[in-house]
UniProtKB/Swiss-Prot annotation:
Gene3D superfamilies according to UniProt: Phosphoglycerate kinase, N-terminal domain
PANTHER family membership: PHOSPHOGLYCERATE KINASE, PHOSPHOGLYCERATE KINASE 1, CHLOROPLASTIC-RELATED
Protein name: Phosphoglycerate kinase
EC code: 2.7.2.3
Originating gene: pgk
Lineage of source species: Bacteria, Pseudomonadati, Pseudomonadota, Gammaproteobacteria, Pseudomonadales
Subcellular location per the Swiss-Prot or TrEMBL entry: Cytoplasm
Pathway: Carbohydrate degradation; glycolysis; pyruvate from D-glyceraldehyde 3-phosphate: step 2/5
Chief location of this protein within or outside the cell: cytoplasm
Gene Ontology CC terms, in alphabetical order: cytosol
UniProt keywords, alphabetically: ATP-binding, Cytoplasm, Glycolysis, Kinase, Nucleotide-binding, Transferase
Enzyme class: transferase
Species of provenance: Pseudomonas fluorescens (strain SBW25)
Chain residues that bind substrate: D21, L22, N23, R36, H59, L60, G61, R62, R113, R146
Length: 387
């Protein structure tokens, strides 16, 4: 994967437009989770150090395109950036006609989704973005799977289009995990439905040695193998699909599970052997023996890809399985990559962020890359790099 990298460019005195993913949760005008902003800071600081006139853009939320809405304004992000950088970061609302920024200074553009044509990737809007800069830097991996004006269109028309350090690091890490992974490789894929992760499961079944499944996905595999799943969430119409995947790769199944009679924070948790699951039981986590078995598989791996918690970890009594696997990944010497919103929440809860080789910032983009799909915003950078 060959793209031009921002780190290799001379940015002195250049007008640089950086597309970041600053789509953060905001409550009462205050940023409540700053992970994405923190991830973008090294790129912004580097561009400033290189003497660029820096313009940063992003979307936030899902406003009606072409219309301003105060709740989706990037004003709280501009205030956060000002504090984080120790300098004024003005929020510019009217920028398409041109904006005055000096070398070494920075501005934040208002939400790109307030511009008509952003989501439809209009050439007219993309050309307006491109006219603002000498160099366009795509650094928002989380939106790389969407072909929009500020992620894809602008890269077609900008004089120079490059990948920022954050995007480049994502591509390098995913390439390492999926391109030619150190073997043996284990993948954990968990979620409510096989149908939503079918392409991921099929793609990983071709490169990994152990495909550990969790959540509703595991229930479908259990049912496909003839085990009772009670009233657990599973997909009866995908049993043959599960069997076909299990025929291609080792899919270790739970030997014990944690069940409850209801899905609730106050639900009583009971550990049962898989054969003992009753008709009115719901499987909400893997059991302690299964967690220990899976942890051993992870310890023997050289590459680990983790997408999804294996139980309802939001309720502590159903979090042990995810906790044990998180700790096993943390203690492993394998190259480990984790991605997906629920996965990041589990990593935070169990305090293992510093012990995972790479944590992907992109939810949908992460999954599409794992599926082997082309990410439009990356593809256009590759095309531009070829000249």
């Amino acid at each position: 994967m060959t793209v031009l990298k921002m780190t290799d460019l001379d940015l002195q005195g250049k007008r640089v437009l950086i597309r970041e993913d600053l789509n953060v949760p905001v409550k009462d005008g205050v940023v409540t989770s700053d992970a994405r902003i923190l991830a973008s800071l090294p790129t912004i600081k580097l561009a400033l150090e290189k003497g660029a006139a820096v313009m940063v853009c992003s979307h936030l939320g899902r406003p009606t395109e072409g219309e301003f809405s105060a709740e989706n304004s990037l004003k709280p992000v501009a205030e956060y950036l000002s504090k984080a950088l120790g300098r004024d970061v003005p929020l510019v609302a009217d920028y398409l006609g041109g904006v005055d920024v000096k070398a070494g200074d920075i501005v934040l553009f208002e939400n790109v989704r307030f511009n008509k044509g952003e989501k439809k990737n209009s050439d007219e809007l993309a050309q307006q973005y491109a006219a603002l800069c000498d160099v366009f830097v795509m650094d928002a991996f989380g939106t790389a799977h969407r072909a929009e004006g500020s992620t894809h269109g602008v890269a077609k028309f900008a004089k120079v289009a490059a990948a920022g350090p954050l995007l480049a690091a994502e591509l390098d890490a995913l390439g390492k995990a999926l391109g030619a992974p150190a073997q043996p490789m284990a993948a954990i894929v968990a979620g409510s439905k096989v149908s939503t992760k079918l392409d991921v499961l099929n793609s990983l079944s071709q490169i990994c040695n152990q495909l550990i499944v969790g959540g509703g996905i595991a229930n479908t595999f259990l049912a496909a193998a003839g085990h009772p799943v009670g009233k657990s969430l599973y997909e009866p119409d995908l049993l043959d699909t599960a069997r076909a995947i299990a025929a291609k790769v080792s899919v270790p199944l739970p030997v014990d599970v944690v069940v409850a009679k209801e899905f609730a924070e106050s639900a009583e948790a009971t550990v049962k052997l898989i054969a003992d699951v009753a008709d009115d039981d719901m499987i909400l986590d893997i059991g302690p023996q299964t967690a220990a078995n899976f942890a051993e598989l992870l310890k023997a791996s050289q590459t680990i890809l983790w997408n999804g918690p294996v139980g309802v970890f939001e309720f502590d009594q159903f979090g042990n399985g995810t906790k044990v696997l998180a700790k096993a990944i943390a203690e492993s010497s394998a190259f480990s990559i984790a991605g997906g919103g629920d996965t990041l929440a589990a990593i935070d809860k169990y305090g293992v962020a510093d012990q995972i080789s790479y944590i992907s910032t992109g939810g949908g983009a992460f999954l599409e890359f794992v599926e082997g799909k082309v990410l439009p915003a990356v593809e256009v950078l590759e095309t531009r790099a070829k000249g």
